[in-house]
Amino acid sequence: QVSSAASDVYKRQVLFLLGILYYGVDDDGQQFRYLGVLQRIAVCYLFGGLLFLNFRWRGLLLSSVLLLGSYWALMSFVEVPGHGAANWEVGTNLAHYIDTQYLGGYKWSGDWDPEGLLSTMPAIVSGILGIFGGMLLKNPNLTGSMRAIWILAIGGACLGGGYWWDAYASLDYN
């Protein structure tokens, strides 16, 4: 399992470096973009893969709940220096503050970047949801129709949960 973890890390490093090579430098060649889509995929794939190698489905579920709960708590309760109380508004929230203070380089759109540091937490959970889907599809104890029923039921529950959760933590991409 050590070689599998080492291989997992190596593949993600290559993907991260490809993202830096592709997205890394602005048009003037003066500033560097540290995080982009490929880098985000590499980070999520790395953490998801390492969690998958070390935990069963309950550990993955607990990791997902902890990541989303921590993200929500940070965004909802941590005061943003220079902007006052915690908020979810683009440009004044904690994720933007952390990216501005610690990420450096140029951003995707002015002073904002959708692939930031703090916002990677829920993105990792999206990767873990994909792992759950793969685990369900590869389960030898389920027939094809039972897999379809489970996927529809879980998808419906996630949609309902997301609709309910939107009242507490809005889903903003822009």
Feature annotation, model-predicted:
Residues 4, 25, 50-57, 131-141:
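Structural signal for the C-terminal ends of transmembrane alpha-helices
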Residues 15-24, 68-77, 156-166:
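Aromatic-anchored segments of alpha-helical transmembrane domains
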Residues 132-174:
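Long, well-ordered mid-to-C-terminal structural blocks that present hydrophobic/aromatic surfaces
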Residues 34-46, 121-129:
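Membrane-embedded alpha-helical segments of multi-pass membrane proteins
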Residues 57-127:
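Long hydrophobic alpha-helical segments that form multi-pass transmembrane helix bundles
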Residues 55-65, 142-150:
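Membrane-interfacial entry segments at the cytosolic side of transmembrane helices
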Residues 1-6, 10:
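Single conserved hydrophobic/aromatic residue that forms the stacking wall/gate
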